[in-house]
């Protein structure tokens, strides 16, 4: 009888082509997602070597990072570098026979939202993209992670990837989530617990009652930020929630193929007695709504808490780093989180740009107005999310409240397009990174859930969504 295996072990074993004595392995790749920023050099490398894309039907190209989200984006991209990258992807996709969603295609959006909603992402697959937040797709029980540009070329040419196997880590969130606490709070709490290096060298499997209770949108939020916890990838075993989400998606299996697929997918779970190299357990009942205060995703605290004092940290290097973060953020120790006023609100990104996120925002802001001191924007994660939101009348709620309703794209998650913070502006953001300059030069980013961001937009400062009336 074979030894019990984790979910990660099973997917790895199913895709192992070859292994060397030093641990170097060759993995088969089922799906390759491509966007405009990390692919130009890879395609050019193929062109110069006279190679073709080995499996164009397993490759999908989408523009997302550089595209404008303003209503007039059909007039073209003003920034020359951004325009060149977008035009290059369109040309490369055509030259190499890869399916491509342009900014004028309603299926276009952030690549990690597009893949799942098209059924391109399926359980048990290996999925790569030249983007760190490829871990999002792990919500489906797929082994998904980011790769570099040279690796993008390697996968395009061979449909394989050279890797070394990571360690197994389990993060179990027991119990039921309290009202007002979301998937975003779960993953921020996990990163706060283990730190941004806590998952280094590991693939994390998320489990427990609180994880099982999440929708697929919530599970994608959790897996999306696995990389912020230092791990290579995040995984959640597929179940009926997964199957229901995938069923009838454009690229999902149909008929007998569907039945066979589900039969296989049901085997994708960790065996009883399988070994994890590290186990972390959290109690969902103790989780509050969370807000980040510093310039790292591990710098988090309860919305009812205060900005911590770095002098309480024993490690000198870390203490110095946290003082630098406070200086950058313009905050002082002991300041109540609910006393921090904001200038901007960004709701969107591959972390929280899905229809469930927008519904949560609408529930908070309906019949209310954005504070006069705040500029707020909502960017749907894809054209299909935008279409669904408008069919439900959410756009009207947003506009009446004073939000700017945009076109799909990565937008203000990162300062690679027209949507960015001005120096000194403080933003409540549903994105995944609060690094210095991430949303714009000297911009100050606070990470939080969509409902919390929406409430902050109305109040003009952070508020506890549990007390929202």
UniProtKB/Swiss-Prot annotation:
GO terms for biological process: L-leucine biosynthetic process. Keywords: 4Fe-4S, Amino-acid biosynthesis, Branched-chain amino acid biosynthesis, Iron, Iron-sulfur, Leucine biosynthesis, Lyase, Metal-binding. It is an enzyme of class 4 (lyase). Transmembrane segments: none annotated. Its EC number is 4.2.1.33. It catalyses: (2R,3S)-3-isopropylmalate = (2S)-2-isopropylmalate. Binds 1 [4Fe-4S] cluster per subunit. SUPFAM superfamilies: Aconitase iron-sulfur domain. Pathway: Amino-acid biosynthesis; L-leucine biosynthesis; L-leucine from 3-methyl-2-oxobutanoate: step 2/4. [4Fe-4S] cluster binds at residues 350, 410, 413. Pfam families: Aconitase. Coiled coil: none annotated. Catalyzes the isomerization between 2-isopropylmalate and 3-isopropylmalate, via the formation of 2-isopropylmaleate. Heterodimer of LeuC and LeuD. This is 3-isopropylmalate dehydratase large subunit. It comes from Rhizobium meliloti (strain 1021). The gene is leuC.
């Amino acid at each position: 009888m074979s030894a019990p295996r984790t979910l990660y072990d099973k997917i790895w074993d199913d895709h192992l082509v070859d292994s060397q004595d030093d641990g170097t392995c060759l993995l088969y790749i089922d799906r390759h997602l491509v966007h405009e920023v990390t692919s130009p050099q890879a395609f050019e490398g193929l062109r110069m070597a006279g190679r073709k894309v080995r499996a164009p039907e397993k490759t999908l190209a989408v523009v997302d990072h550089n595209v404008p989200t303003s209503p007039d984006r059909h007039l073209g991209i003003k920034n020359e570098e951004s325009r060149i990258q977008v035009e290059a992807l369109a040309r490369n996709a055509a030259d190499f026979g890869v399916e491509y969603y342009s900014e004028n295609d309603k299926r276009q959006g952030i690549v990690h939202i597009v893949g799942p909603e098209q059924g391109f992402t399926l359980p048990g697959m290996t999925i790569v993209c030249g983007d760190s937040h490829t871990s999002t797709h792990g919500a489906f029980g797929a082994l998904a992670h980011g790769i570099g540009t040279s690796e993008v070329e390697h996968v395009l040419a061979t449909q394989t990837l050279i890797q070394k196997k990571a360690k197994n880590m389990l993060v179990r969130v027991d119990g039921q989530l309290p009202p007002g606490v979301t998937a975003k709070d779960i993953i921020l709490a996990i990163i706060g617990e283990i730190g941004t290096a806590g998952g280094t060298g590991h693939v994390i499997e998320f489990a427990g009652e609180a994880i099982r209770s999440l929708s697929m949108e919530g599970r994608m939020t959790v897996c999306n930020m696995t990389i912020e916890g230092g791990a290579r990838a995040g995984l959640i075993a597929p179940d009926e929630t997964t199957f229901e989400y995938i069923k009838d998606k454009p690229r999902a299996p149909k008929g007998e193929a569907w039945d066979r697929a589900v039969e296989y997918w049901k085997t994708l779970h960790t065996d009883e007695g399988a070994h994890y190299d590290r186990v972390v357990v959290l109690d969902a009942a103790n989780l509050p709504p969370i807000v980040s205060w510093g310039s790292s995703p591990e710098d988090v605290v309860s919305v009812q808490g205060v900005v911590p004092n770095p002098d309480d940290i024993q490690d000198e290097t870390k203490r110095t780093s946290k003082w630098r973060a406070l200086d950058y953020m313009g905050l002082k120790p002991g300041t109540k989180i609910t006393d921090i006023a904001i200038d901007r609100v960004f709701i969107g990104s591959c972390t929280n740009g899905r229809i469930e996120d927008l519904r949560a925002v609408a529930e908070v802001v309906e019949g209310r107005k954005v504070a006069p001191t705040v500029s707020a924007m909502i960017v749907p994660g894809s054209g299909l999310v935008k279409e669904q939101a408008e069919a439900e009348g959410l756009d009207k709620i947003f506009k009446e409240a004073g939000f700017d309703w945009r076109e799909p794209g990565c937008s203000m998650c990162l300062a690679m397009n027209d949507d960015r913070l001005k120096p000194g502006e403080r933003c409540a953001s549903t994105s995944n990174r609060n690094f210095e300059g991430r949303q714009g030069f000297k911009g100050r980013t606070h990470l939080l859930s969509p409902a919390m961001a929406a409430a902050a937009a109305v109040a003009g400062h952070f508020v506890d969504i549990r007390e929202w009336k």
